[in-house]
Amino acid sequence: MSRLVIALGACLLAAFALAADRLAPPAGVEVYFIAPQNGAKLHSPVTVKFGLKGMGIAPAGIKFDNTGHHHLLIDTDFSELNLDAPMPATDKIVHFGKGQTETTLTLAPGKHTLQLVFADYLHQSFDPPLHSKKITITVE
């Protein structure tokens, strides 16, 4: 039993040691969609263009001051994210770790929500978090 407690304690210490403090962004940063616009009615595939003011873009894994990269939430609520952990890569949370500023999505017909989250070189949210307004589009 004591070995188990020691092992669990070691794992917890390792997790805390690996946890990075969230970086503070400069004041006045804006994350937004260039396209599509909120309420747009489109056909799939949908081209999505990302906007950013007040910071720069850098690939994931490369630490430069005041830079980061985009993540796109598709039909996912920002409030569901664990901001104290790196963002997971899923079919609903798309990483653009090469520094991309646009993508093409194949979406099923119907209403969809999109939201951008800008994160640091470790896929970690800034503190305070940087994100766009959520937009809703309709794919016809």
Task: Describe each PLM feature range.
Residues 83-105:
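A beta-strand/beta-hairpin structural motif
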Residues 51-62:
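Short amphipathic, basic-aromatic surface patches that mediate peripheral association
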Residues 14-16:
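N-terminal signal peptide c-region/cleavage motif recognized by signal peptidases
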Residues 46-50, 101, 110-118:
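Short, well-structured beta-strand segments within conserved domains
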Residues 21-43:
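Short, compositionally biased P/S/T/A/G/V-rich stretches that sit at domain boundaries
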Residues 108-123, 131-135:
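Internal, hydrophobic beta-strand segments that form the core of beta-sheet-rich folds
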Residues 1-4:
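Positively charged n-region of N-terminal signal peptides that target proteins for export
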Residues 62-70, 131:
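Short coil-to-beta strand junction motifs in C2/discoidin
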